[in-house]
Amino acid sequence: MENILDKFLRYISVDTQSDPESNSQPSTNKQLNLLNLINEELHALGIESSVDEYGYLMASIPSNIEKEVPAIGFIAHVDTSPDASGKDIKAQITSNYDGGDILLNKEKNLYLRVSDFPEMAQYKGQTIITTDGNTLLGADDKAGIAEIMYAVQYLCEHPEIKHGEIKIGFTPDEEIGRGVVKFDVAKFGAKYAYT
């Protein structure tokens, strides 16, 4: 089973910035590159999925229980902020974080400082993933995509885990306020959904 970190690193490698100046939906075609990649991954797992003309990917994992229960959904967005470059992202992985400042970029003297972000201390001993200071990281919301896709893969590989119908949705253009403009709630079909 592919680990969640590898999924995340693959997803952030795809530039998916949205464009507030565009009148199309999705606002950039590059968002479709990631949507199509995810769609292929879902098909490889045997999951029915499709991407519509507006850049919404919807998928469904059938229930494997006899009892009828409401469908639940999980949703994440594929676009990244237009405020910083999302091209050629170079993730830096700090394993067993020591609790101190993290150097992002030596040439720019750019650090994540504990004095600026004291909550960093609670992650001592864990793995921290950052940008190299030249681009955004894209964790909003490619971390969400990786979590959802890891869960989907896990459920597909562990049919002994009983569940009702699960709906999956990936949307474009959230960063520019258009993420749900043409999202078809009825087609999605979840009684409850989590983002």
Ranges and model annotations:
Residues 2-127:
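Acidic/His- and Gly-rich active-site-bordering loop/insert found
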Residues 121-195:
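Acidic/histidine-rich catalytic neighborhood of metal-dependent amide-processing enzymes
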